Swiss-Prot record:
InterPro entries: CSD (IPR011129), NA-bd_OB-fold (IPR012340), RNase_B_OB_dom (IPR013223), RNase_II (IPR011804), RNase_II/R (IPR001900), RNase_II/R_CS (IPR022966), RNase_II/RNase_R (IPR004476), RNR_Ribonuclease (IPR050180). It catalyses: Exonucleolytic cleavage in the 3'- to 5'-direction to yield nucleoside 5'-phosphates. One of its GO terms (cellular component) is cytosol. Residues 190-517 form the RNB domain. Belongs to the RNR ribonuclease family. RNase II subfamily. HAMAP family: RNase_II. This is Exoribonuclease 2. One of its GO terms (biological process) is mRNA catabolic process. NCBIfam families: 3_prime_RNase, PRK05054.1, RNase_B. It comes from the Bacteria. PROSITE patterns: RIBONUCLEASE_II.
Length: 649
């Protein structure tokens, strides 16, 4: 009687049209069902049958219904697929190709074929780049992808590097130089400073040496500093093929074990590199650091020839200053250079401590990797006095460049940091007040007030308070016009000391040269500023991904399960604690199930950065705890830890 009843059909359509819809991101689980996350506080259950047409990460619109007194959602419309261009591993079954996306929550095989422009032949276990072409929620009967590029084969020891670079669509090889790129274009009107005892201080294995220093003391206690910087723009014409390549790469990409240079290695590591006893063209800056640590207003930029007299290492110089080890400077003159540079460094640290912002010393971790990609060890590296000598010299040079650009043309590529926006400033003030630290919004949104806040926090030396305040701070950025850098404590700051490695520094080199030569200066466009920020983000993500991969390999091979590690809590998420192992720098995740067996009694408060059990605070960001490793998952590059349940001091 009711079959094919147009009134009933229309009624169903009307009810369906009036049913509420929700928009959100699909979150899958290992047990087949999923959730639609509408916002950080609200999510809806997706039954297993409804998960078959979507993938983890898809942005969708779903129909909200009730089933057995529980709200559930039924995916209805795809807004944005999680997968577009992606990387994955090939599986071959019955001569058919499938690809498994390389993402933690995506485990299903996707049917695939090479596209018409892909000449590679794919075997089982190969890694590939693919493009999702069909999606079930779009009405297609299957998920389907086209293979666009083979990354590497299953037995390649460099898989973590190649796959990560492909994932972030980053270059794998150095650019090639043409003959014209190796010819010096700017040889005239350079001061000959080859008789001065310039020195370089760097890591022992550094080949792309950007900076050399020469210092002398004046009778009144002031220090004369000449910073000489490698001059790749003397070889690379603006708008040339190589310049365009550099403008796309933006940075030399430093990954654990090796780097992918912005410029050809025969330029970055030979012709332009300030190697010892080689005559090199440079862009130089003559600065006077007054005996009170301030920088004199008299700043001179000029083109020059120099010849570095010695390539020194951070460790050797630090050992000699600290009077340990057997190394001594090769000549008395170089020994004198080190002593004056040390004095300059101490003057500037004292000045910055009083007038700007000093960074806390931090530990860095470096993978020692063989040429064939084998992990040998993870080394702990601390910033020593020689690192600070170079850092202070480069800071002086960059402040000087910013002032010089602003005074003469009013633009360049500036590093800027705005401190707090208004909302976060209010939150920061409220938080500080709870610790009896009284600041006003007006105060901490000025450069002077921000610096004062940072100095107070350094004196208090409370890592929890420090981490919370950093959470309220803005991110660093780039600007084509002068602006303050609150995090450094300077009214303006522009880098130019790494033109071999940074395209932004090449831009500033060209602007500085245009002022020196009294030529027309062309203001950089906003598009290049955006490109610099985006490329920096992608490079950092690639470095993080490679590190995560290497740590899982390293810890698996070392069989570290059940060994106790000291760790620092770095973040509190919705479902657990993130921490860093102090011994080797590995990031680990401690899920709630390993912290307390009853989920309802757990409260992960992301806002405060604390974990409560039955209302009592047990953990907070910056706490030092002991953990054991319970699971090391190579497929998802994740390390699962559990607390030993006793904090250590």
């Amino acid at each position: 009687m009711f079959q094919n009843n147009p009134l009933l059909t229309q009624l169903k359509k009307n009810l369906h049209a009036k049913s509420p819809r929700v928009e959100g991101i699909v979150k899958s689980t290992e047990r087949g069902f999923g959730f639609l996350e509408v916002d950080p506080q609200k999510s809806y259950f997706i039954p297993p049958k409804n998960m078959k047409n979507v993938m983890h990460g898809d942005k969708i619109i779903a129909l909200l219904t009730t089933e057995k007194d529980r709200e559930i959602v039924e995916p209805e419309k795809l807004i944005e697929p999680f997968l577009n261009r992606f990387v994955g591993k090939i599986e071959k079954k019955d001569n058919r190709l499938f690809i498994v996306p390389d993402y933690p929550f995506l485990k299903d095989l996707i049917t695939c074929q090479p596209n018409k422009n892909c000449i590679n032949i794919f075997q089982n276990g190969d890694w590939a780049v693919a493009q999702l072409k069909k999606h079930k929620l779009k009405g297609d009967h299957l998920f389907y992808a086209e293979l666009t590029e083979k990354i590497t084969q299953e037995d390649d020891p460099l898989i973590p590097w190649w796959v990560t670079l492909a994932r972030h669509d980053l270059d794998r090889k150095e650019p090639l130089a043409e003959d014209d790129d190796l010819i010096l274009k700017e040889s005239d009107n350079r001061k000959d400073l080859t008789d001065l005892d310039f020195i370089t201080i760097d890591n022992t294995n550094t080949k792309d040496i950007d900076d050399a220093l020469f210092v002398s003391e004046k009778n009144n206690g002031d220090i004369s500093l000449i910073v000489a910087i490698a001059d790749p723009t003397a070889y690379i014409k603006h708008g040339s093929k190589l310049d365009v390549i550099a403008s796309k790469r933006i940075f030399t990409n430093y990954l654990p074990g090796f780097n992918i240079p912005m410029l050809p290695r025969n330029l970055s590591e030979d012709i332009c590199s300030l190697n010892p006893n080689k005559r090199r063209p440079v862009l130089a800056c003559h600065i006077t650091v007054l005996k009170n640590g301030n920088i004199s207003n008299k700043i001179e930029f000029f083109l020059a020839w120099i010849k570095s007299k010695s390539k020194l290492s951070y460790d050797h110089v630090s050992d000699w200053i600290e009077k340990i080890g057997s190394w001594i400077p090769p000549t008395k003159s170089i020994a004198n250079q080190i002593l004056i540079l040390h004095r300059l460094c101490l003057l500037r640290i004292k000045w910055r401590k009083k007038n700007a912002v000093l960074f806390k010393d931090s530990i860095e971790y470096r993978f020692h990797v063989s040429e064939h990609g084998k992990i040998i060890d993870v080394l702990i590296e601390k910033r020593r006095i020689a690192h600070k000598i170079i850092e202070e010299s480069m800071i002086v040079a960059n402040i000087s460049a910013a002032n010089f650009l602003s005074k003469n043309i009013g633009f360049g590529i500036y590093n800027v940091h705005s401190g707090f926006d208004l909302v976060n400033a209010e939150n920061a003030v409220s938080f500080l007040r709870s610790y009896n630290l009284n600041f006003t919004v007006k105060e901490i949104t000025t450069l002077k007030g921000f610096c004062n806040l940072r100095r107070v926090l350094n004196i208090i030396s409370n890592n929890y308070i420090d981490s919370r305040i950093r959470r309220f701070q803005s991110f660093g950025d780039f600007s084509t016009i002068p602006g303050p850098h609150f995090a450094l404590g300077f009214s303006e700051y522009a880098t130019w000391t790494s033109p071999i490695r940074k395209y932004s520094d090449m831009i500033n080199h060209r602007l500085l040269k245009s002022i020196i030569k009294k030529e027309k200066s062309i203001k950089p466009g906003e598009d290049i500023k955006i490109k610099i920020s985006e490329q920096r983000r992608r490079n950092r993500m690639a470095e993080r991904d490679v590190l995560d991969w290497l740590y899982t390999i390293f810890l698996q091979k070392k069989k570290y399960q059940n060994q106790k590690f000291n760790a620092e809590i770095t973040d509190i998420s919705r479902s657990g604690i993130r921490a860093r192992l102090i011994e080797n720098g590995a990031n680990v995740f401690i899920p709630g199930t390993l912290i307390h067996p009853i989920r309802e009694e757990l409260n992960f408060n992301q806002e405060s950065g604390k974990v409560f059990i039955n209302g009592i605070m047990h953990y907070k960001i910056s706490d030092l705890i002991q953990v054991t490793l319970s699971d090391i998952r190579l497929k998802t590059r994740s390390i699962i830890a559990k607390p030993v349940f006793e904090k250590f001091k």
